[in-house]
A protein has these predicted regions:
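Iron-sulfur cluster-binding electron-transfer modules in prokaryotic oxidoreductases
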Residues: 1-197
Length: 197
């Protein structure tokens, strides 16, 4: 988003989030927003490779808020945390992802938010091409993940795509393409790990 908001501003906003985390006594961060996860990952990487940017950000944050921060010891998307405990959750579940009338596993299509693993494939479970975070949960809980041709296609949401009126046609066209790709498989439901999607 640095073409719309200066990168220094984005870094300072992220630093404020880290400061709030630090002030609350937490060491780990688990954002549910895919875009935030991608931005936090990118900024931590930038600070690692360009420490002068981190120092500049610390100065901006202090000047604006009189706050300081520690970087998170661990950064994981919320879906990664749930995935990590999927088997423990399965052992305690009351219901499985199974049709109660037929015993057939529910057919589930997933949509992985673009900023989950496309920017940094090593940070997402299964990487960018074959993300397994949601399908792994579905399998562990008795459902049947369904692969479909446009599984990795963007849903079209994107802040610039949906929030800017002139771009909404692009957003709707992407969603339509995605839904049409799912339709022949007659899924019982769709899951996603992105609140925007």
């Amino acid at each position: 988003h640095s073409d719309v908001v200066p990168i220094e501003t984005i870094m300072t906003v992220v630093a404020r989030h880290f400061a709030l985390m630090t002030e609350a006594g937490f060491e780990n961060m688990t954002p549910s927003c895919i875009t935030s996860f991608g931005i936090y990952t990118e900024i931590l990487h930038t600070w690692e490779t360009h420490p002068e940017w981190e120092e500049k950000t610390r100065e901006f944050l202090w000047k604006a808020t009189k706050r300081e921060f520690q970087k998170p010891k661990n950064l994981a998307h919320t879906s990664d945390v749930i995935y990590k405990f999927r088997n423990e959750i399965a052992a305690q579940k009351k219901y499985s992802l199974v049709d109660i009338h037929t015993g057939r596993p529910l057919q589930v299509v997933d949509h992985i938010g673009c900023h989950y693993a496309k920017m940094f494939p090593s940070k997402g479970i299964g990487g960018a091409e074959f993300p397994a975070v949601l399908s792994g949960m579905v399998s562990a809980w008795g459902g049947q993940p369904v692969d479909y041709p446009e599984r990795r296609h963007c849903c079209g949401f994107g802040f610039r795509n949906y929030l800017v009126l002139a771009n909404r046609g692009f957003s709707v066209a992407n969603s339509k393409k995605k839904f049409e790709s799912m339709q022949p498989y007659e899924p019982d439901f769709i899951i996603t790990n992105c609140p925007g999607c």
